[in-house]
């Protein structure tokens, strides 16, 4: 059984947040506290080390006491750039990734991912959600992967590809379906932030 000490968490806070007017999403208040604090609080009991991927406000993120990793590219290349620098700095066999703007992320995320990863010869496992209409939606930035995939990812990125699902297709992957879709709700616009705050009063 994979123990939590064998898993590092990588919180992805390195995006442009264009739909939020370019504001650094990890530092946007949610019920009075920066979104990054919700991510840390929900992950810290699920894993061993925590890493933060950010490309601005580095001093502020570093004040939380965790290593802050900047993308090696300079053009906000998306979550795979974060995955890459995370694996490069991961000191554990497994890496759990999560965005900074999903303040309700499941507190059993790692545990359920571990069960699925151990159930077969998988390289990685990602989350999916079941909507009220029964439709399954992939949530690929919530992912538990073997940190040994670093070379695979770097080879993929060297081709110029940035799409996360394309990389997954080249690997042995599986998914865990979570019934609580709201747990994966993320904040992309001011309106979504307001709606999520109102729904969680």
Feature names for model-found ranges:
Residues 2-161, 166-185, 190-195, 200:
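Nucleotide and nucleotide-moiety/phosphate-recognizing core
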